[in-house]
UniProtKB/Swiss-Prot annotation:
Keyword Glycoprotein annotated: no
The protein's name in its UniProt record: Calcium-dependent protein kinase 26
Enzyme class of the recorded protein, top EC level: transferase
Gene Ontology MF terms: ATP binding; calcium ion binding; protein serine kinase activity; protein serine/threonine kinase activity
Autoinhibitory domain as annotated region, ranges: 288-318
Phosphoprotein as UniProt keyword: yes
Organism listed in the record: Arabidopsis thaliana
PROSITE patterns: EF_HAND_1, EF_HAND_2, PROTEIN_KINASE_ATP, PROTEIN_KINASE_DOM, PROTEIN_KINASE_ST
Role, per record: May play a role in signal transduction pathways that involve calcium as a second messenger.
Coiled-coil residue spans: none
Active site: 148
Keyword annotations from UniProtKB, A to Z: ATP-binding, Calcium, Kinase, Metal-binding, Nucleotide-binding, Phosphoprotein, Repeat, Serine/threonine-protein kinase, Transferase
EC number: 2.7.11.1
Gene that encodes it: CPK26
């Protein structure tokens, strides 16, 4: 997207739309994401309530960001009508925002519902995964790969009806043709399929991700776990599934058989979504037992869910605090590397520029970096590609941003985050139902009942759960260039 006069002037949607304020009145904030905010809104003509996702155009830096938003809207329209996919009502644009109006899901997140209910069994997990894999099958049958399935992306329309579960976020979804191979690394670390990390994948990756969700639903923890993001990736590529630790000795063989079929490392041998739905463990009146699972499963599920929520809040704080000045700093860096002022960085310019910033990367690593950043495969990196490749990675873990996020929670400046301060932050972020004791318990390594800065940083670096890992697998640009 051209930056003439700022991208606010361009039509992201390709045409002028009616003003959203003529049709809807915007209400209170429901949530915050990397690119914008979701509000409650009311249709003026009918009084019906909807959710409105307002995307900040200022943050759509590259052409790819704009295409992602357009594609998300197209895919939501394309999938409209499937009962477990959120219904889009319309999309609108003004000089500052793109607004997507959709069905309101006020019943809360999937994990929260499981935890609140208390009684939980394999049968209940089977009912839930049947809905999730049903969404995958619907997407695949219509030529859509989701690419970012995770529990947070499933909400209940009504908190008393588990069958009202809806998939809500299609921001990373793409259209695919049979046999088409994808290379960009996207998704969330705990859920990513091995072939995605190897940059050679298709729709089978969605079934792997659903298999990870099923493992968590039954045991309370993810199957591939480590202290760092790289450690998680290594575990995913190794593919060893733990069926020995508690609660697995008490879990049915049929459940384990299904998980093995979904978490098969070879995509060609993995179950399809259709095969999963026909598995005896999942079928109606199937073999999934209805006896209560060990209470420790719910307890672990609470801790895993709670830690992710704290991390998401911290990432929002960081994303919102990125200033025009910081983007300007990256602009200067781009200019310094673009020595011939052509508006694009060649391989040689990138290599020379990284050397100036103290990098010791090998040529092959610089080539990988170049490929990851070169979105349009032109052989060079233009300004938009450079900003997109660097802003989403380096900003999240830079020391000053982690410190400012920590200070956001540490309201009294004591050097510790307490349960009261977390409560205050949750209220500010509209996340009042988070299980705060479990957040503290999970993150607090020295068991003093509060979170210090070291514990906070360790949590943030344990598998970032942001909206996308796009390009973050090429960690070296952050370590060698931008942290200077």
């Amino acid at each position: 997207m051209k930056h003439s006069g700022g991208n606010q002037a361009c039509y992201v949607l390709g045409q002028k739309t009616p003003s959203i304020r003529d049709l809807y009145s915007l209400g209170h904030k429901l949530g915050q994401g990397q690119f914008g905010t979701t509000y409650m809104c009311k249709e003026i003509s009918t009084g019906r309530e909807y959710a409105c996702k307002s995307i900040t155009k200022r943050k759509l830096i590259s052409k790819e960001d704009v295409e992602d938003v357009r594609r998300e809207i197209q895919i939501m329209h394309h999938l409209a009508g499937y009962k477990n996919i959120v219904t889009i009502k319309g999309a609108y644009e003004d000089p500052l925002y793109v607004h997507i109006v959709m069905e309101l899901c006020s019943g809360g997140e999937l994990f929260d519902r499981i935890i609140q209910r208390g009684h939980y069994s394999e049968r209940k997990a089977a009912e839930l995964i049947k809905i999730i894999v049903g969404v995958v099958e619907a997407c695949h049958s219509l030529g859509v790969m989701h690419r970012d399935l995770k529990p947070e992306n499933f909400l209940l329309v009504n908190k008393d009806d588990d069958f009202s579960l809806k998939a809500i976020d299609f921001g990373l979804s793409v259209f695919f043709k049979p046999g088409q191979i994808f290379e960009d690394v996207v998704g969330s670390p705990y859920y990513v399929a091995p072939e995605v990390l190897l940059k050679h994948y298709g729709p089978e990756a969605d079934v792997w991700t659903a298999g990870v969700i099923l493992y968590i639903l039954v045991s309370g923890v993810p199957p591939f776990w480590a202290e760092t993001q790289q450690g998680i990736f290594d575990a995913v590529l190794k593919g060893h599934i733990d069926f020995d630790s508690d609660p697995w000795p008490l879990i049915s063989d049929s459940a384990k058989n299904l998980i093995r079929g979904m978490l098969c490392s070879r995509p060609s041998e993995r179950l399809t979504a259709h095969q999963v739905l026909r598995h005896p463990w999942i079928c109606e009146n199937g073999v999934a037992p209805d006896r209560a699972l060990d209470p420790a499963v719910l307890s672990r599920l609470k801790q895993f869910s709670a830690m992710n929520k704290l991390k998401q809040m911290a990432l929002r704080v960081i994303a919102e605090s990125l200033s025009e000045e910081e983007i300007a700093g990256l602009k200067e860096m781009f200019k310094a590397m673009d020595t011939d002022n052509s508006g694009a960085i060649t391989f040689d310019e990138l290599k020379a520029g990284l050397r100036r910033y103290g990098s010791t990367l090998k040529d092959t690593e610089i080539r990988d970096l170049m490929e990851a950043a070169d979105i349009d495969k032109s052989g060079t990196i233009d300004y938009g590609e450079f900003i997109a490749a660097t802003i989403h990675l380096n900003k999240l873990e830079r020391e000053e941003h982690l410190l400012s996020a920590f200070r956001y929670f540490d309201k009294d400046g004591s050097g510790y985050i307490t349960i009261d301060e977390l409560q205050h932050a949750c209220a500010e972020q509209g996340m009042s139902d988070v299980f705060l004791e479990d957040v503290i318990k999970e993150v607090d390594q020295d068991n003093d009942g509060r979170i210090d800065y070291g514990e906070f940083v360790a949590m943030m670096q344990k598998g970032i759960v942001g909206r996308t890992m796009r390009k973050s697998i090429n960690m070296s640009i952050r370590n060698n260039a931008v942290s200077q």
